[in-house]
Amino acid sequence: MKKRISRIICTLLCCAPIAISAQTSEKITSPVNLYKEGKELFQEKNYAAAIPALKAFVKQKPTASLLQDAEYMLVSSAYELKDKNRIELLRKYLDRYPDTPYANRIYSLLASCYFYEGKYDEALALFNSTRLDLLGNEERDDRTYQLATCYMKTDNLKEAAIWFETLRASSPKYAKDCSYYLAYIRYTQKRYDEALKDFLPLQDDPKYKELVPYYIAEIYAIKKNYDKAQIVAQNYLSAYPNNEHAAEMYRILGDAYYHFGQYHQAVEAFTGYLDRDHSAPRRDALYMLGLSYYQTKVYSKAAEMLGQVTTANDALTQNAY
């Protein structure tokens, strides 16, 4: 009898860990815990880790409201992780849940996807279906920046400027980017004083210091402020001799030397421009180079350069003759 009781006790003791393990495993993989785990990881922006738990939860056939939430987190995670099928997943979610409370954010994510693909018209159409003011602050600013850029890329500079101004006033993160694009827009509109006002503070900014000096020097030259144009161009060429804007800086430098009457230096600078610019050179630069050669008595070169200017029936051609 004692032996029988001992065997029963041993059997129970051996089975107990298995039963406890099964209960623990069931507790961990229960729908409630899977949902809780996936949601916590999603809120922590640990999207890759959130996906397995959320997918496992969806397989448990939960209630409609929780299923909608879980699938929202899944498609949002696909967006954040740049899943190649993210556009399709986001659109399918909207088709499945047309009345979802997450529709506004889903539209904003779709717009962002098209923005990154360079499909600016498609992005704009979706942004127009979105209330950006209902997004979280960080995401609102990101989408506003994308919206403004879309307008600029589609040549709607008026709307682009409005949105860049709006964002600059509210977002320290994007303030300098907005200032640059606003300055660029003003530059293209020939509103040079306004452009210069926004370009100047960006001269020492790490992101823009190799870019804005060209516009600053060009504006100075356009406004016939040749001494400042010369200084900016010389400093730039000393710092960034191989930059893509170096050719234009040599042209601006040649422009300044020409108007100072320093024709030898003008020839040298304009030659630097032609050596680096492999596109069609500007006719006004060829004209000034031709006259600089003439002033330095290199008449054959003067004739060659001025001959290249007479390709259109305009004042520059008349002056070249």
Positions of PLM-derived features:
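Bacterial N-terminal signal peptides
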Residues: 10-17
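Acidic, polar-rich low-complexity tracts and alpha-helical solenoid repeat scaffolds
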Residues: 2-8, 20-321
